[in-house]
Amino acid sequence: SGSCEVKTCWWSQPDFRVIGDYLKDKYDSASEMVVEKHRESRGWVETLRPKYNFFKAPTERDLVYYENSPNFCEPNPETGSFGTRDRICNVTSHGIDGCDLLCCGRGHNTRTEKRKEKCHCIF
């Protein structure tokens, strides 16, 4: 009898954190574009070009955009956004729940509360 060896290869995704960090870097360095319409033999053609010429042109692997995101700080019935006014924020956080970001530069009020709660502790 002979021996048989099977080798199986497959692609696996990197860690979710690695993918998230990669996408965040792309988002942070995205290039703003403008849509230009010009006439060619087959009709009107739309192309994208960088809005600012002093930045390098994006490559095929770069992220680009041509519309700005809506302002989520203020209420907007069209988008269904309630804004961020009167939201609870975390003074010590530099993340999306932090007061610097969530309050959109409007400042924030600090409130201290004392509560008595039964904790069902067992000693």
From Swiss-Prot:
InterPro entries: Wnt, Wnt_C. Coiled coil: none annotated. GO terms for biological process: canonical Wnt signaling pathway; cell fate commitment; neuron differentiation. Gene3D superfamilies: 3.30.2460.20. It holds the Pfam family wnt. Signal peptide: none annotated. It is found in: Secreted, Extracellular space, Extracellular matrix; Secreted. Disulfide bonds join C89-C104. GO terms for cellular component: extracellular space. GO terms for molecular function: cytokine activity; frizzled binding. Belongs to the Wnt family. Ligand for members of the frizzled family of seven transmembrane receptors. Functions in the canonical Wnt signaling pathway that results in activation of transcription factors of the TCF/LEF family. Required for normal embryonic mesoderm development and formation of caudal somites. Required for normal morphogenesis of the developing neural tube. This is Protein Wnt-3a. The lineage of its organism: Eukaryota, Metazoa, Chordata, Craniata, Vertebrata. The gene is WNT-3A.
